[in-house]
């Protein structure tokens, strides 16, 4: 049960090698409305051993163990399954050396929290843009409030580049 009347609009545009998302959340209620919003795009991969992550932050939060850890060390375990939250520059990028492609998630502030998630044996990786970390409604960390009768807009895009 979510005690607010709201409208969520996601406009998706397909461009050459790019999928653009324009997200609008409108608070129709008479009270300020807290939000924590994210997308969950999954990407087919050749194999975990063929992935290379580009310009990832030095540290991340291992959400399974709830500990801060070195991002590269954690990504070395992606074939075992990971759930990693990071405060990014607004870009999350990986390359698949066998599929010869680079996937870039562009997710500017306040959509710049990134989660990398894998669930072996499924050959996929999830790059998720988020506005706030887990439990933001409870602890207030990066909690976003939309005033009554107002809206908030978020943008993200996924770009695919051939590495041939």
Per-region residue spans from a language model:
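Beta-strand-rich interaction surfaces with strong enrichment in secreted/lumenal proteins
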Residues: 9-11, 141-146
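A short, structured loop/turn motif at beta-sheet edges
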Residues: 13-18, 45-52, 96-97, 118-122, ...
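Glycine-rich active-site loops that engage anionic ligands at enzyme catalytic sites
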Residues: 96-134
């Amino acid at each position: 049960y979510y005690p607010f009347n709201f409208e969520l609009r996601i406009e998706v545009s397909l461009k050459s090698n790019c999928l653009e998302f324009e997200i609008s959340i409108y608070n129709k209620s008479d009270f300020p409305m807290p939000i924590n919003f994210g997308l969950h795009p999954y990407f087919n991969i050749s194999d975990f051993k063929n992935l290379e992550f580009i310009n990832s932050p030095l540290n991340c939060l291992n959400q399974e163990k709830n500990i801060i850890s070195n991002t590269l060390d954690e990504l070395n375990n992606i074939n075992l399954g990971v759930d990693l939250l990071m405060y990014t520059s607004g870009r999350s990028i990986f390359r698949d050396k066998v599929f010869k492609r680079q996937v870039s998630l562009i997710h500017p502030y306040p959509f710049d929290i990134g989660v990398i998630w894998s669930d072996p044996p499924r050959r996929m990786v999830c790059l998720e843009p988020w506005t706030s970390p887990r439990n933001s409604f409870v602890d207030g960390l990066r909690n976003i409030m939309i005033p009554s009768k107002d809206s908030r807009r978020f943008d993200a895009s996924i770009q695919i580049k051939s590495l041939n």
